[in-house]
Amino acid sequence: MLALTRKKGESLVINNDIEITILEIRGDQIKLGVSAPKEVPIYRKEVYTQIQQENRKSADAQNAQALKELFG
């Protein structure tokens, strides 16, 4: 993992088209601004993890249904 130090108002750029800016620092919280193309999905980690879990459940259910139909 790359660790960088930034101050309020400073940014970093990822892959030439994603910019992350430190908007505010208050106590132990940091407010980030993210500029990225619309086709780049951006999620908080806890939301992303939940989406992955739901996708796995859905895929498992679809696979189970396909097996039932195949072997009836």
UniProtKB/Swiss-Prot annotation:
Keyword tRNA processing included in the entry's annotation: no
Complex formation: Homodimer; the beta-strands of each monomer intercalate to form a hydrophobic core, while the alpha-helices form wings that extend away from the core.
Function: A translational regulator that binds mRNA to regulate translation initiation and/or mRNA stability. Usually binds in the 5'-UTR at or near the Shine-Dalgarno sequence preventing ribosome-binding, thus repressing translation. Its main target seems to be the major flagellin gene, while its function is anatagonized by FliW.
NCBIfam families noted in UniProt: csrA, PRK01712.1
InterPro entries: CsrA (IPR003751), CsrA_sf (IPR036107)
Protein name, entry field: Translational regulator CsrA
Similarity-based family: Belongs to the CsrA/RsmA family.
GO cellular component assignments: cytosol
Domain of life where this protein originates: Bacteria
SUPFAM superfamilies hit by this protein: CsrA-like
Gene: csrA
Assigned keywords, A-Z: Bacterial flagellum biogenesis, Cytoplasm, Repressor, RNA-binding, Translation regulation
Molecular function in Gene Ontology: mRNA 5'-UTR binding
Lineage, broadest ranks: Bacteria, Bacillati, Bacillota, Clostridia, Lachnospirales
UniProt-listed Pfam families: CsrA
One of the GO BP terms on file: mRNA catabolic process
Subcellular location: Cytoplasm
